[in-house]
Each structure stands twice: as C-alpha cells, then as structure tokens.
Curated annotation (Swiss-Prot):
<feature type="repeat" description="ANK 5">
    <location>
        <begin position="200"/>
        <end position="229"/>
    </location>
</feature>
<feature type="repeat" description="ANK 8">
    <location>
        <begin position="310"/>
        <end position="343"/>
    </location>
</feature>
<feature type="repeat" description="ANK 7">
    <location>
        <begin position="277"/>
        <end position="306"/>
    </location>
</feature>
<dbReference type="GO" id="GO:0005654">
    <property type="term" value="C:nucleoplasm"/>
</dbReference>
<keyword id="KW-0040">ANK repeat</keyword>
<feature type="repeat" description="ANK 1">
    <location>
        <begin position="27"/>
        <end position="57"/>
    </location>
</feature>
<protein>
    <recommendedName>
        <fullName>Ankyrin repeat domain-containing protein 61</fullName>
    </recommendedName>
</protein>
<dbReference type="InterPro" id="IPR002110">
    <property type="entry name" value="Ankyrin_rpt"/>
</dbReference>
<feature type="repeat" description="ANK 2">
    <location>
        <begin position="75"/>
        <end position="104"/>
    </location>
</feature>
<feature type="repeat" description="ANK 4">
    <location>
        <begin position="167"/>
        <end position="196"/>
    </location>
</feature>
<dbReference type="Pfam" id="PF13637">
    <property type="entry name" value="Ank_4"/>
</dbReference>
<dbReference type="Pfam" id="PF12796">
    <property type="entry name" value="Ank_2"/>
</dbReference>
<keyword id="KW-0677">Repeat</keyword>
<dbReference type="InterPro" id="IPR050663">
    <property type="entry name" value="Ankyrin-SOCS_Box"/>
</dbReference>
<feature type="repeat" description="ANK 3">
    <location>
        <begin position="132"/>
        <end position="161"/>
    </location>
</feature>
<feature type="repeat" description="ANK 6">
    <location>
        <begin position="234"/>
        <end position="273"/>
    </location>
</feature>
<dbReference type="InterPro" id="IPR036770">
    <property type="entry name" value="Ankyrin_rpt-contain_sf"/>
</dbReference>
Amino acid sequence: MGNITRKGSRDLVVDSAKSLEDGPSAALHSKLYEAIMREDCTTIEVLLRNHPVNQPITILPNSASNRLLLTQPTESIIPIHLAAKYHKAQSLLCLLRHGADPEVRDTTGLTTLNLMLLHWPVTSTTWAKPGNRTHRILTDIQNSSITCLRILCAHGAQVNTQGEISNKRSPLHLAIAYGCYPVLSILTQNGADVNAINEASMTPLHMAANMLNKEMMETLIAYGANVNCAVSSTGNTPLKLAVCTASSKAGRLLGAGVSCIRLLLTHGAKVNAQDYKGQTAIHEACFGGREAIINLLLEFEANVNILTRNGESPIYMYLQRSCNVRDTALLARLLYHTYPLRMTNNQGILPAGIMLPEFRLLRDTLIKQSQKPLSLQGICKRNIRNIYGEKYKQHLKQFLPVTIWNSVYCCYDLAYTS
C-alpha cells in the first residue's frame, strides 16, 4: 500500500486550482463569484446546490469577473471570504444562511472576521462636504461594512480568535492597527476581550496609545481596558507609550498627544510607573523636551527625583539634548522640583547635551549645586512642592501664611541657569 495522507482545506484550495480547467467547474466558479459580487442571492442559492458552500472557488485569468479580484494568474477564495473582503452584506447573509462557516480559515490562517478587518475601507468623510455625492458614497461604504460585521457577529463569529500568522492579533488588535474605529464598540459588545495581548504582549490600548488615537482609547477605556497594564517584555504602560510618541519630533510638530495623555491620567494611569529600565513617563518627556507634556505630568504629580536602573534622573535625561538645555525656563521649572540634584549616571558620566563649550558656565554651576547640599528650608520647600504638586497649591494657600506660600511657590531656582 502506498502512503495515505489526509488532505485539509489548504490542500483542497491548491487541488481545485489545478483541476479547474479540466471540468465544468470553471463556469460554475465564475458565475458564483459574479453572483456574490452583485449580491444576487437568488443565483447564489441555485449555484450552491452544485458547490459546497465552504469550498473555495477559483477564478481563471480569462474570466471577465477576474478583473476585480485577481492580480495573479489564479486565486482561490472561499465564498464567505469573498463576501467579507468586499463587504457584500446580502451575499454574506445568504451564504451564512446556507451553512457557511464564519470560522473557516484561508491558506494563511485568517478567519472571515480577520479578512474583513484587514480589508476595512478607508472612508474618512472629514474632507467631503456633507450631502454631496462623494460623502454619500463613502457613508454607504462605511455602513455596508458595519452591516457585514454585525451579520458576522450575529452568526457566531468568534471575536477573540487570533489569526495564525498575523502576529497573534485578535480582531480588536486588527481594528486598532487598520484604523477601524466603528468596529471597536461592536466587537466589545459581542464579547471581545479589551485586555487581550498580541505576540508583542501589547493590549489594544497599548496600540491605540502608541498611535495617539484618542477616539479608540476612549472607547477601550469605556469598555474596561486596563490603563496600567505593562508590556511583559519592556514594562511599558499605555501612558509611557503615549508620552514617547507625543514627545517625538513628529508629535512636537503636529502638537499631538496631550489630550491622549490627559485621558489616561484622569482614568487612573500611574504617572510614576517604571519600565524594566526604571524609566517613568517623566523621563521620556524630559528627553523629548516638550513643555506641554512635562507640565501635564507635573500637574499629575510626576516625581522628578526617580532614578533609572542606570542612575539617570529626569533632569539628566533633559540635559542629554542640547536643544533642551537652551530652554532655560523649562530647565528652571524642573530644577524647581528636584532634590537632590544628580548630574551623573551610575558610571559617573555627565549628560551629553551639556558638554558643549557654549554650556560650560551652566555645566559648572549645576555641578557645584549638585555637590552643595540645600539648606533645610530649601529642602522643605521642595518637599512641599513635590508632595502637594501643582494641583493642590491653591488649596494649600488657604492654610499657609502668604509670605511662606510665596516663598514656596513663587521663587524658581533661576540662579542655576543664570
């Protein structure tokens, strides 16, 4: 006896393509394809009498219908996948009613829901005038896509199933990656796990925060996303990722991210959470040097005295870049909260940005200050500022004599930067 092997669905896809030209299947496949694309449910029902609903169809190069679908000589596709990719709601519903399996996978391991999200239409209407033809077309496309998603969910599509070769991303991860904002609430209402992790151990909120997509972040948080979940490989939280992106050159130029960071902080993000290198959000913000973000973190009581595992303070990170050093007002604000002032890391190395000749006087001044202990009064002032922060300083004014309050809050350490 020869070797007997079991053929799975992937083998059937290949075999059907090889044998298609040898029989009447070519015409049947072509007609079924065209009926699905036209959403001709009557014809679909007739053709399914002679074609198993979960078996792929293959369109040949000389098929007229092939123009819309194929860029390769032949392509095999399962009928329900075809309807999902092109968001043909009536065809999708017809196929499901005739036994189509929403969990059937293609040769790359993707389910119907995975494929639908991967082909979600980009239909932003912000540039189109409401009511005109373009706006109506885009709105119709979006509505058709949403209808297809609702149909799939209503027929038992698994909303937490991960694609085999899609970096283990759940449908929610795919929706975030491909900008499918309307999808989020539908998936979560149908049981999608908002705290599921992908192959990189990132939750959907990690991804949305990294992209500074506030709408998606709001939806995920509303459905219970953990704002303090840390990526297992790095220790990064959504807050740290949002601060990193917002502090980048692009974030600075676009003025993006402040509202996203505030959203996380107001929903309980731990402002002083440290990653595996010991860095906090304020370390990242200080390195980026974007004043609005630094001020926001300070407003939520970010600790400017936390050291990384390598002994680097937020001030150290700020002084790493010469462009930051030139902003003496922001430097003074950071010094206003800092004690003790630590100018080197664990290896005794000074920040690179302050080593330029033009900063020699400032460098020498800061080094001297770091070696000189503050007076007890100065230490007390800093402790009060760090304990009560910016949010409670007006409240504190009700309990302290005016002269003391002014000495605590109205005198920046400008002598450091003079």
